[in-house]
């Protein structure tokens, strides 16, 4: 059964008072759920899918600023596509790699996403960075309270991702990138469905 946000927040408040957790957050939430929970126990951060290909949660940014809540961006590279290291010839083993069934990795998607890849290449050249670093820097420079959490399987990629923190984009540059992204017709992407209505809670 669905549990009211106030009830969840009360439990989190108890855990904080007991010293068992320091902060708490909500994954894939709605504004209403966030506000109701926050009134009972201040929410530290929410976690939602966010990348250059999935930007629908930007509508929540004013609310997050109002409440002082951070934004943890998962899948900030669209499951690796925005690293610009893959091509239409890339294949994944469906038995071991879930990207095999993701729409952004279909052959026709690479054709449709060429303008996006071109944008990433141009920005990477301008800033002497990689496409992954540009994708991460774009969101980190957009708001200081956005924290991307890209996944990786090797140390070299981890170091590359950390390097994104050294890239500085002005507010004007970020707005220009957003404006260009608005004009690009992109392929379908995994996780592009509406917000999940039943949030999950996370304690730490």
Residue ranges: model-predicted function:
Residues 1-184, 197-204:
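Beta/alpha (TIM)-barrel catalytic core signal, keyed to glycine-rich beta->alpha loops juxtaposed to Asp/Glu
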Residues 189-194:
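Short coil/turn segments at secondary-structure boundaries
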């Amino acid at each position: 059964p669905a549990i009211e946000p106030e009830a969840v927040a009360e439990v989190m408040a108890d855990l904080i008072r007991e010293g068992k957790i320091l902060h708490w957050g909500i994954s894939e939430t709605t504004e209403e759920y966030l506000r109701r929970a926050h009134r009972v126990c201040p929410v530290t951060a929410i976690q939602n899918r966010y990348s250059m290909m999935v930007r629908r949660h930007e509508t929540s940014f004013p609310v997050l600023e109002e409440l002082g809540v951070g934004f943890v961006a998962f899948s900030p590279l669209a499951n690796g596509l925005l690293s610009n290291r893959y091509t239409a010839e890339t294949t994944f083993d469906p038995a071991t790699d879930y990207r095999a069934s993701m729409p952004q990795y279909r052959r026709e998607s690479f054709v449709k996403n060429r303008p996006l890849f071109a944008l990433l290449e141009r920005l990477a050249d301008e800033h002497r960075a990689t496409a992954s670093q540009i994708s991460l820097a774009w969101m980190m420079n957009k708001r200081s309270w956005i924290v991307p959490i890209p996944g990786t399987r090797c140390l070299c990629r981890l170091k590359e991702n950390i390097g994104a923190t050294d890239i500085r984009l002005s507010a004007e540059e970020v707005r220009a990138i957003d404006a260009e992204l608005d004009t690009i017709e992109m392929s379908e992407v995994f996780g592009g469905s509406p917000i999940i209505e039943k949030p999950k809670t996370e304690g730490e």
